[in-house]
A protein has these predicted regions:
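Catalytic alpha/beta active-site cores
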Residues: 1-201
């Protein structure tokens, strides 16, 4: 590793004199403390990678013939991108932090728990995550909410139109929660989570 070049890059990053270092990723604001820390660690990783990646491959990269993606995370024991098995996590429960999360009993709670899963994954890796067939994966929780509304209908003699409207509202509100939370929560490296949702229909 060229320590003089590493020192120069770190110094230029800290005094913000090299915009290639401070603005290298449009999704990362170098003024945020956690992003600043992430970018600084990335400088070290890129330099260290020069010594651990085969020389001919690094030369290929450095000469511009190709690009080795995510050199700023190369030396970290983090995963890059994943297909989250959220249906299993929701159904069987999981532990996040020190809390044991059990299976949600309604659609709205399932959406809230799903945002917590997304946040935990985003803070434990770099890159994107996919929530495949979200309509299929969340359908059991729409059913749980419907079953609750049917019980309420029976107990209070409510109309079918009323409970159908209540279910529509819960689904809308749950989706809104999922949208707002995943777009406003910031991961440990200072970014909103990169998420792909797909429908199974």
């Amino acid at each position: 590793m060229q320590l003089d070049k590493l020192y120069t890059d770190v110094t230029n990053f800290l005094n913000q004199s090299n915009t290639d270092l401070t603005n290298e990723n449009a999704n990362k604001d170098a003024k945020c403390v956690n992003t600043h820390r992430d970018l600084l660690a990335g400088i070290l990783s890129k330099h260290y990678s020069q010594d651990v990646i085969p020389k001919e491959l690094m030369q290929w990269h450095n000469d511009g013939y190709g690009h080795i993606h995510d050199l700023d995370y190369y030396i970290s024991p983090l995963t890059n991108c994943c297909l989250v098995n959220y249906p299993d996590m929701l159904k069987n429960g999981f532990t996040i932090g020190c809390a044991k999360i059990e299976e949600p009993k309604s659609f709205s709670v399932a959406c809230t728990v799903l945002t917590q899963i997304v946040q935990a994954v985003a803070s434990s890796q770099y890159g994107g995550q996919s929530l495949a067939h979200i309509d299929v994966g969340l359908e059991p929780y729409v059913q749980k909410s419907w079953d609750k509304l049917l019980a309420k209908q029976k107990a209070y003699n409510l109309s079918t139109e009323y409970i159908e409207e209540e279910l529509r509202k819960e689904v809308y509100d749950g989706c809104q929660t999922l949208l707002y939370q995943t777009n406003s929560m910031i991961s440990t490296n200072g970014q909103a989570a990169f998420i792909s949702l797909s429908l199974g229909l």
